[in-house]
């Protein structure tokens, strides 16, 4: 039995029969019938000398609790730091190559991957100034640096939502009228017990003007949330406004995925990897709310009144500070890009 991802809560009550799906997995349980016999063999092995690890190391190991053990001899910058390395990683291992700096020239056919190998070998950034200039020239002021925080309930809590649907409860917005110009900060964090999405829509309408580029890091996420908001029971005027926003987005993640690579990014364009490198001193470390998971947990505590008043007030400030940091970070990333040209 598992959650039905197609289920939509249409009333105040959950339809349990529709929420869950029964699936026959008998055929997948067959291997488990051998567990008892395998345990006997494992007890025998446990008494013997530890065997050499012969398993191929894969990117999926990131989620394994034994990663540190199996990856003990892995180079600091490995072949798995090359973005989208895929099956080439297995081929390289068969040739005894784990260090990204040892990948032979021309081995990787992707131009992006080849550039990353060069960055790791030389220890110097790759900068495509022409493309960065084009990206910056495409920005239309005022700029709206925008970031959502969302919560996703396994069992839908609000009407017209499905399991694990992302529900916007907060956003931060920095507004800039010209390059390196002064910043105006706006923010929204839902207070109340209703569906936060409707108040979120009103705040978006209030703060985002009809013109200007909207900046996000990994903009697809923000665009998806906005498009989902437009499906709610709101006026046609509000729907049209929301649906006009996705086409205005520009993505800083795209720039650091294509036009600027630094060896200390270690192959990632995540803002948590990029920010400490290009903006030293600006970090999420030591923030009481320091990532999206923390933000989700914090909102749950506030929404369901799980804290004394003073603790709730402090947590609310911490939540606002975290989301503000996200959009301020994007401001600094764009400032950095201007400095590159």
Give the location of each predicted region.
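Acidic, Mg2+-coordinating catalytic module of metal-dependent nucleases/exonucleases
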Residues: 3, 12, 16-19, 23-79, ...
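Short, flexible loop/turn elements at secondary-structure junctions
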Residues: 68, 148-152, 175-177, 192-194, ...
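Generic, well-ordered alpha-helical scaffold segments in large soluble proteins
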Residues: 95, 139-142, 172-176, 203-214, ...
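Conserved RNase H-like, two-metal-ion catalytic cores of nucleic-acid enzymes
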Residues: 131-210
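Conserved DEDDh/DEDDy metal-dependent 3′-5′ exonuclease domain
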Residues: 1-36, 185-296
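Short, motif-level signal for alpha-helix interfacial/capping segments enriched in acidic residues
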Residues: 65-66, 76, 119-134, 229-232, ...
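N-terminal accessory regions of nucleic-acid-interacting proteins
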Residues: 78-143
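Short helix/loop capping segments that flank catalytic or ligand/cofactor-binding pockets
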Residues: 72-74, 91-92, 101, 153-156, ...
């Amino acid at each position: 039995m598992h959650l039905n991802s197609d289920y939509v809560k249409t009333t105040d009550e959950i339809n349990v029969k529709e929420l869950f799906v029964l699936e026959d997995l008998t055929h997948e349980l067959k291997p488990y019938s051998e567990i008892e016999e395998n345990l006997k063999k494992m007890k025998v092995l446990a008494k013997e000398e530890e065997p050499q690890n012969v398993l191929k190391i894969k990117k999926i190991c990131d989620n394994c609790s034994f990663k540190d053990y199996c990856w003990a001899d892995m180079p600091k910058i490995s072949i798995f730091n090359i973005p989208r390395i895929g099956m080439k990683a297995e081929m390289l291992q068969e040739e005894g190559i784990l260090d990204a700096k040892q990948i032979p020239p021309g081995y990787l056919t992707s131009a992006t991957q080849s550039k990353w190998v060069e960055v790791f070998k030389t220890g110097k950034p790759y900068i495509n100034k022409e493309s960065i200039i084009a990206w910056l020239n495409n920005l239309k002021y005022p700029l709206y640096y925008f970031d959502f925080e969302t919560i996703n309930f396994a069992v839908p809590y609000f009407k017209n939502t499905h399991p694990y649907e992302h529900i916007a409860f907060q956003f931060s917005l920095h507004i800039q009228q010209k390059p390196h110009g002064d910043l105006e900060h706006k923010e929204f964090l839902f207070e109340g017990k209703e569906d936060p999405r409707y108040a979120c829509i009103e705040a978006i309408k209030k703060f985002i003007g009809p013109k200007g580029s909207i900046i996000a890091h990994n903009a697809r996420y923000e665009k998806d949330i906005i498009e989902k908001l437009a499906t709610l029971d709101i006026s046609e005027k509000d729907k049209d406004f929301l649906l006009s926003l996705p086409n205005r987005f520009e993505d800083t993640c795209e720039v650091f995925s294509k036009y600027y690579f630094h060896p200390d990014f270690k192959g990632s364009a995540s803002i948590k990897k990029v920010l400490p490198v290009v903006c030293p001193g600006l970090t999420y470390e030591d923030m009481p709310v320091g990532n999206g998971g923390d933000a989700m947990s914090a909102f749950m505590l506030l929404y369901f009144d799980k804290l004394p008043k003073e603790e709730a007030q402090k947590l609310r400030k911490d939540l606002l500070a975290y989301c503000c940091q996200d959009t301020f970070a994007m401001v600094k990333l764009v400032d950095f890009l201007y400095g590159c040209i």
